[in-house]
Amino acid sequence: MRVAFGKLRARLATGIGSTVAVCAATVYGILGAAPPPAATEYTAGSQIEAGQWQVIPRRAWVSEEKKVLGVRLQEGERALVVEAELNNRTQASTRDYAKLLKLHPVGGVPVPDPEVALVREARPLPLLHPGLAERVAFVWKLPASAVLPTSLDADVIAKTYKPVDNLYGTPGWFNPRVVGRITMAVEVTESVAGWAS
């Protein structure tokens, strides 16, 4: 009788454990499938806290010049530019700003990461130092055949500071996530006015 009771107890424990595991997986699956919260909407002049960066978008414009603030364009390319004030809120100089703004597809075509230029010196932006706000330009290269938007939509991507990384045990900025969306009108010069949608 003692052996049978031990087997019964083992089967019962296994059954309960399995049931709890299945229920937990179901609950986590349901919670994970929930839609993410709506992103905060920002416009030109909005002050945005984005983890290690503070960004204030100023204006968006289009250029067909061969060189836009130090960023060279190839034949058959145009530039979609977002000017913004950018402030490094960390304690170290960094150039981790290229993925701060993610432009939504233009005319259904995905857009690569921008090149970032320093407006006051018209050259590609090097390290950005802590506490020193700079006016910068995010320059996306687009094919000349791309239909230009009259309004620009871009996600603002922030990272979270971790004092100890799980993999290396060092501090850093990790886990990029969308913290908002910038919507602003695109200024089109006369030379490219015929291309706007």
Model-derived regions: residue spans:
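Membrane engagement elements in two modes
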Residues: M1-K66, Q74-E75, G172-S197
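Short strand-coil-strand connectors
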Residues: E49-W53, V106, D155-K159
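Hydrophobic core residues within well-ordered beta-strands of beta-rich domains
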Residues: W53, L80-V82, E134
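The feature marks short-to-medium sequence segments in extracytoplasmic or secretory-pathway proteins
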Residues: W61-S63, Q74, N87-V136, P163-G169, ...
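Short solvent-exposed strand/turn elements
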Residues: G70-V81
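Extracellular Ig-like/FN3 beta-sandwich strand-entry sites
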Residues: A79, A133, V147-P149
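Short, surface-exposed secondary-structure boundary micro-motifs
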Residues: E85, F138-V139, P143
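Short, surface-exposed ligand- or partner-binding patches at beta-edge/loop junctions that are enriched
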Residues: L142-G169
